[in-house]
Amino acid sequence: MMTFCKANTAYLLVLVALAFSSCNQKKDVSNGYNPLEVSVGLQKTMCYGSCPSFNFSVLNNGHATLTVGRFAEKAFGRHLNEGKYTGTIELHEISKITEFAEKSGYLKLEDRYDNPMVMDIPAAISTINRKTVFNRHEGPDLKDLYSRIEHLISTVDWVEKPDTEK
């Protein structure tokens, strides 16, 4: 019986040691792997009038998506049917936008500028490198940033997604 207890104790100690050693394992992320995340995004919401509405985002690998709503031609200066699109943007073009935003103090802005009592003003929701700003009422003037993003959108060769993928 004593040998059985010693064997079980030794077995239990080995299991505990293995369990603790696996908790200390650290994953090496220095291999250059970058998780995909939104580098630049801009969404403009509808209003009761003819405000352009769309939702654009580009990942840090250059993969871009665009959902076109009503009156979007006003924003990009070109006609795109309402629907969903994909495209690719060169990384240096993305960097131009993110660097401009960072130099302009974008990362120091509040997250939300809004007044729920004001209804007929469209919102502009922008994202630059994990920082998102909801700008609808009495917020900072980000028209220059929005214009740069909208110009970028206008230069992409968008591919419309078929209805089955929407």
Over which residues does each language-model region extend?
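A short-motif feature that recognizes glycine-rich, charge-decorated loops
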Residues: 67-108
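Short, solvent-exposed coil/turn segments
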Residues: 13, 51, 80-82
